[in-house]
Amino acid sequence: MKRAAFLFIIITGIVCFAIACARSDEVRKTEATLYFVDAEINRLLPYTCELIDADPQHMAEAAVEMLIEGRDDNDKIRRLIPKDKSCISTRVDGGTAYVDLSSDITETLPYSRDIEKLFIYQIVDTLTGIKGIRFVKFTVDGVVKKDFMGYYDMRETYKFVYPE
């Protein structure tokens, strides 16, 4: 009887340990806000989505990928970022996201101060909404430039502007 009770306790302990240590197949996700330009090109529209809960670098890459993918199914949103994954790359270091833009993007954007502002802050407001990112700095083709389209100083450090 003692032997059976002892075996029962040991087996129960092993099962409990195995259950506690079992890896969950469930992927943890976190809510994020992406900003898209409205159809009239007047303002940014917040769009809530879920990103895989990871470090800021991976979350920034996923958010930028979603911005590039766009919301073409929504007629209230206008695409400013071309649907080309090589047009934007990101790197996160010390709370700052470094965003490298391809100069080819300017070929698809109409020249306007408002459009440049919406384009920049669509990226800035999306990235600064990610835990661990407070600021955004831009380069164009890997080089820090004075401006992107002639209106905004790309040497600046940008932070969140548009409240929800």
Protein language model features and the residues they cover:
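Bimodal "functional hotspot" detector
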Residues: 2-11, 15-164
